[in-house]
Curated annotation (Swiss-Prot):
Keywords: Isomerase, Magnesium, Metal-binding, Phosphoprotein. The modification Phosphoserine is found at residue 103. The gene is glmM. This is Phosphoglucosamine mutase. One of its GO terms (biological process) is peptidoglycan biosynthetic process.
């Protein structure tokens, strides 16, 4: 992880951590990088989109100023899911894609994600290079372009339809007579998800689809599925689908209001693909956070689980290295490599409903054979500086090491820093529910005591 980039772009509280100055410097640095790497291109184009946060306008303006001053041309495609930016970037043969979003984070935060010309997130090496440019702007700005050589910003919001139509075409047939509740988190999916499911003739109820700039992810979406659960039961819907702020995550709800996490959705999709002969190598990639019960389910169905570090970029790296077509995270990031270059919540939800339709089984029935082992996850708030050095604390590390030795055959312990928020995440799992929960609480209390 670099000085500015985390596991998913640059992120922080808008106007305090992710400032106008930082966005402007990123615009200069990215523009310089693109110019240097495309010396024979007269007109270098990038695609830019955003979620619904009020601070997106501010950051867009700063990024635009930096990029256009370096001669870059920007097509702004408006409010669109993050994977929509990745898709349009590749289709339009742009040199980069930029998404202004803090994903599932609170409305006060914002972030900037960058994709390369193929629609993949930037490598660590390229991010490091851009960070170097951000810290050495004197050299970059020493010879500014002449006034008639600068780039240009234009609205290209009709390009949204290219992405929307692509999603619709990913489904064979339609979803007639399937009753679905969508929770679009007052975010980037508020238009796309509704449009696609209506195109496919689903019977829809849509909630949290009235963004005002400040209500994104507020008690709604994939991180707060409680209301969705109640609405699904109340409307007697077949299922509910919840996205996060930039719609790269999906969490589902069955007809009884039970929440279905990303791992279980991956399990359902993977088995559906295996039965159709499209699960290449019969392998799935998830992360170290995946429940051992999920791993057992895959094994029973002759599917091998490969684990990657947390973060969809690391999942994708392993998928590419091992030639795997489906992977993702418990949190709902799901990558379907035959269809997309990054996690796409709307695409994943379409494929989930397709499995339900084709098997004739409801979501509750499909998920019932995935039995979770007891697992406890506790998030401990820690400021970003202490978060990055938590594992240097001898008292904390000694306690974790001793617990690992004592309970190595009974409990799996995983403690890690969040790549996107000021949190240390403590996860424990095993067969003894009380022991699993107590260990997680003991570790979390110790971290709280030592670091706060």
């Amino acid at each position: 992880m670099g000085r500015y980039f985390g596991t998913d772009g640059i992120r922080g509280e808008a106007n305090r951590e992710l400032t106008v100055d930082k966005a402007l410097r990123l615009g200069y640095a990215l523009g310089y990088y693109l110019k240097n790497n495309n010396p024979n291109e007269e007109k270098i184009k990038v695609i830019m989109g955003s979620d619904t946060r009020i601070s997106g306008y501010m950051l867009r303006s700063a990024l635009t100023a930096g990029l256009t001053s370096m001669g870059i041309y920007i097509d702004f495609v408006g409010v669109i899911p993050t994977p929509g930016v990745a898709y349009i970037t590749k289709q339009k043969k742009a040199k980069a894609g930029i998404m202004i979003s803090a994903s599932h984070n609170p409305a006060k935060d914002n972030g900037i994600k960058i994709f390369n010309l193929e629609g993949y997130k930037l490598s660590d090496e390229i991010e490091n290079q851009i960070e170097d440019y951000m810290d050495n702007l004197d050299k970059i700005l020493a010879n500014p372009l002449a006034g008639d050589k600068v780039g240009k910003f234009k609205y290209a919001e009709d390009e949204y339809f290219q992405y929307k139509n692509y999603l619709t075409q990913c489904v064979k047939g339609n979803f007639k007579d399937i009753k679905i509740v969508l929770d679009t988190a007052n975010g980037a999916a508020y238009r796309a998800a509704k449009d696609v499911f209506l195109d496919l003739r689903a019977e829809l109820v849509v909630i949290n689809d009235a963004p005002n700039g400040r209500n994104i992810n507020v008690k709604c979406g994939s991180t707060h599925p409680d209301i969705l659960s109640k609405v699904v039961v109340g409307y007697e819907a077949d299922l509910g689908l919840a996205y996060d702020g930039d719609a790269d995550r999906l969490i589902a709800v069955d007809k009884f209001g039970n929440v279905i996490d990303g791992d279980k959705i991956i399990g359902i999709l993977a088995l559906g693909m295996k039965n159709k002969g499209t699960l290449k190598n019969n392998k799935v990639v998830t992360t170290v956070m995946s429940n051992i019960g999920f791993e057992k389910y895959l094994k029973e169905n002759s599917i091998e689980l490969l684990r990657a570090n947390v973060g969809d970029r690391y999942v994708l790296e392993k998928m590419l290295a091992e030639d795997v077509v489906i992977g993702g995270e418990q949190s709902g990031h799901i990558i379907l490599k035959d269809y997309a270059t990054t996690g796409d919540g709307v695409l994943s939800s379409l494929k989930l409903v397709e499995v339900i339709r084709d098997t004739g089984k409801d979501l509750h029935e499909l998920v019932s054979s995935i039995k979770d082992a007891p697992q406890t996850l506790i998030n401990v708030k820690v400021d970003n500086i202490k978060k990055n050095t938590w594992d240097k604390n001898e008292i904390i590390m000694s306690f974790i090491n001793e617990a690992n030795k004592k309970y190595k055959d009974e409990v799996r312990i995983l403690v890690r820093k969040s790549g996107t928020e000021p949190l240390i995440r403590v996860m424990t799992e095993g067969d003894d529910k009380q022991l699993v929960h107590k260990l997680a609480e003991d570790i979390a209390h110790l971290i709280e005591k030592e670091l706060n």
